């Protein structure tokens, strides 16, 4: 189309029409052509105007073809990226409640991002719900990228692609480059910071809409704060000194890369600072907790300025670390799936300091001996956990911290390290990628896996067995591929109350006639507990009948938060001969046959699916209260049965009843007979008197 309208094309067309002219002109032109053909060819002859025109057409056509191929290549690349993003979003499988929450928080930001530019003759677009949290502020995530010098180019670009996908979903990233000053020190640190900042910038440039930019010299540091001890609210003297570039980047929907150095307010000299202090300073700034101090040039104490004006809504803080999340004692070679910081911080920190790390390797060559390596790993895990505590203290309870590895952030886990063999058709048969942990968490506000799932149920944690075989003339061996996830989601969480305290005295059956916990004790808020049960089951509890039933069998209760969730557990006596309940309990106690039983498991409707309350209750029950096992029952048509089945060792439907029985103990015919007897004979205590249906 363009070539036909060009001057070169018209000139070639006129030359091609010369033989069709008048006879006189035809004779002259033929003579000219004959004369030209009879003369020896030379470079000067080849430079005739019409030949140059033909060559111009060829060059222009080649340029257009190259441009077309480039455009098509970019289009295919863009379509592939959009497809990958769409699949990542669809694989999250959010609940209706989670999807509505994500749309409420991020739809206004997406509406601004994709607002059409220029004049449009179409009708007005439907208005998105602008009643987002924090007055419709832009939503940002502060990302700490630790030790980028140990991350290869493919993984770094994958991390950049994920950050660009988060940007497309409405979450801007502020990337803090942490070159790990414990590994690189002295004069060698500055060039490493510069180089790794450039690599992080290049990795984030993978998508055109990312528009990443480096924000150097935006951080300041108070004079004389080199030895300051940073608290949970302070940032060790580091603060945002230049706001305008950061605000402009927010308006431009740009990804920001921040190197870890700050300018002293008294000497104007730049010096390196700890990345954790930069993360805390940025968190305070965007949250509106940094206030100007005219006397010192730095930020004032937050208690002097109670009014806060946030610049953005910080939804997530992400720590991308080659080590991944903090190790968990119940997941060998794996990390905590979910951390309820109020409840689990102390125990997690204690395990970090006591655990051995023989399987982990540091990519940096700066560490030599094994003891130094273990100490370094402990320190980095402890630093990440301490930073997480400081962040969740600053931010609202809805915010969270995600700690993951570069491979999982890039969604490359399971791909690297696998040998590729050309087996024809079989070579094209691939397993599906695991869920992108960061995208899944953004949409669902949950970890990729439930923290209450047994370790063997983690799909990503099942190593493939070593296989050997022959295909064609080739012998092959597939090495075991360990794809255990090392991603941790941490939130401020809720306090956990267990009565009686199992850390003081483990739960054991109470002897007949001895004092025991009762639901009417002053330590139990019975009205709140009854409301929790009524709301969760959507039925009214017959309170007095229930109190009478569990009066002599109560083992303990678990309460999360302000009675947002909880469980009531009992010691039940099997009674195959239908003797009086007191006699059955005494006999079972003497024989050691009392059954640990989950009597009530409840979560408020408004809290169901949020904050991992059900996981917190279930974990407390099976790991702390009844570590040797527990059983319970549920109606056969209960939609929660799938959730129960995934967390139990076994289940069975009881014949001639409407109950399914679940247990977490080892299989034993004798014990399971007792379990079945208990599950069949316990009478429900509902005020509607509809228990006959069960």
Swiss-Prot record:
Region (Disordered): 20-44
Keywords (A to Z) from UniProt: Acyltransferase, Amino-acid biosynthesis, Mitochondrion, Transferase, Transit peptide
Subcellular location: Mitochondrion
Source superkingdom: Eukaryota
Mitochondrion is among the record's keywords: yes
Presequence positions on this chain: 1-56
Catalytic activity line of the entry: L-glutamate + acetyl-CoA = N-acetyl-L-glutamate + CoA + H(+)
This protein's record includes keyword Transit peptide: yes
EC number: 2.3.1.1
Alphabetized InterPro entries for the sequence: GlcNAc_Synth_fun (IPR011190), Vertebrate-like_GNAT_dom (IPR006855)
A cellular component term, taken from the record's GO annotations: mitochondrial matrix
UniProt record similarity statement: Belongs to the acetyltransferase family.
UniProt protein name: Amino-acid acetyltransferase, mitochondrial
Species per Swiss-Prot/TrEMBL record: Pyricularia oryzae (strain 70-15 / ATCC MYA-4617 / FGSC 8958)
Classification lineage: Eukaryota, Fungi, Dikarya, Ascomycota, Pezizomycotina
Underlying gene: ARG2
């Amino acid at each position: 189309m363009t070539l036909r309208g060009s001057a070169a094309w018209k000139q070639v067309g006129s030359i091609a029409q010369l033989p069709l002219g008048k006879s006189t002109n035809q004779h002259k032109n033929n003579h000219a052509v004959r004369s030209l053909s009879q003369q020896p060819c030379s470079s000067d002859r080849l430079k005739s105007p019409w030949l140059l025109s033909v060559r111009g057409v060829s060059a222009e056509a080649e340029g257009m073809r190259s441009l077309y191929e480039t455009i098509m290549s970019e289009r295919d690349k863009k379509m592939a990226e959009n497809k990958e993003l769409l699949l990542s979003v669809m694989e999250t499988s959010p609940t209706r409640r989670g999807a509505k929450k994500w749309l409420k928080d991020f739809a206004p930001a997406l509406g601004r991002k994709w607002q059409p530019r220029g004049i449009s003759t179409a009708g007005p677009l439907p208005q998105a719900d602008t009643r987002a949290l924090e007055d419709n502020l832009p939503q940002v995530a502060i990302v700490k990228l630790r030790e980028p010098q140990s991350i290869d180019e493919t993984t770094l670009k994958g991390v950049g692609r994920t950050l660009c996908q988060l940007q497309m979903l409405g979450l801007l990233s502020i990337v803090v480059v942490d070159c790990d000053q414990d590994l690189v020190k002295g004069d060698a640190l500055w060039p490493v910071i510069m180089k790794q900042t450039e690599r992080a910038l290049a990795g984030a440039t993978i998508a055109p809409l990312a528009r990443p930019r480096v924000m150097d010299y935006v951080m300041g540091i108070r004079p004389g704060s080199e030895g300051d001890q940073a608290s949970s609210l302070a940032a060790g003297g580091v603060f945002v000194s230049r706001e305008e570039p950061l605000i402009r980047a927010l308006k431009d929907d740009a990804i920001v890369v921040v190197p870890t150095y700050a300018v002293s307010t008294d000497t104007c000299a730049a010096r390196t600072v700890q990345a954790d202090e930069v993360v805390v300073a940025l968190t305070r700034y965007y949250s509106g907790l940094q206030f100007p101090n005219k006397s010192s040039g730095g930020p004032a104490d937050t208690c002097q300025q109670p009014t806060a004006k946030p610049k953005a809504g910080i939804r997530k803080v992400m720590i991308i670390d080659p080590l991944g999340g903090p190790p968990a004692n119940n997941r060998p070679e794996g990390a905590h799936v979910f951390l309820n910081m109020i409840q689990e911080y102390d125990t997690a920190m204690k395990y970090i300091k006591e655990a051995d790390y023989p399987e982990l390797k540091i990519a940096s060559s700066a560490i030599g001996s094994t003891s130094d390596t273990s100490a370094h790993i402990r320190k980095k895990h402890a630093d990440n956990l301490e930073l997480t505590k400081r962040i969740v203290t600053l931010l609202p309870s809805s915010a969270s911290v995600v700690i993951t590895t570069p491979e999982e952030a890039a969604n490359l886990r399971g791909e690297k390290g696998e040998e590729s063999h050309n087996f024809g058709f079989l070579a094209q048969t691939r397993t599906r990628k695991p869920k992108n942990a960061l995208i899944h968490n953004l949409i669902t506000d949950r970890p990729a896996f439930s923290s209450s799932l047994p370790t063997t149920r983690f799909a990503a944690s099942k190593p493939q067995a070593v296989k050997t075989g022959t295909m064609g003339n080739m012998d092959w061996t597939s090495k075991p591929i360990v794809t255990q996830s090392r991603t941790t989601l941490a939130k401020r969480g809720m306090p956990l109350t267990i009565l009686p305290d199992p850390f003081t005295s483990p739960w054991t059956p109470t002897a007949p006639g001895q004092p025991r916990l009762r639901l009417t004790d002053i330590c139990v808020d019975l009205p709140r507990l009854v409301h929790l049960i009524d709301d969760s089951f959507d039925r009214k509890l017959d309170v007095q009948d229930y109190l009478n039933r569990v009066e002599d069998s109560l083992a303990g209760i678990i309460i999360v938060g302000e009675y947002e969730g909880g469980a009531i557990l009992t010691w039940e006596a099997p009674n195959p001969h239908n003797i009086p309940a007191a006699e059955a309990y005494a006999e079972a106690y003497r024989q050691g046959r009392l059954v640990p039983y989950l009597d009530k498991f409840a979560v408020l409707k408004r809290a169901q699916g949020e904050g991992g309350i059900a996981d917190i209750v279930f974990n407390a029950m099976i790991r702390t209260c009844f570590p040797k096992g527990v059983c319970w029952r549920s109606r056969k048509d209960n939609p929660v049965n799938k959730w129960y089945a995934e967390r139990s060792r076994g289940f069975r439907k009881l014949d001639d009843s409407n109950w399914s029985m679940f247990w977490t103990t080892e299989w034993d015919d004798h014990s399971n007979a007792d379990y079945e007897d208990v599950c069949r004979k316990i009478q429900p205590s509902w005020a509607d008197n509809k228990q006959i249906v069960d």
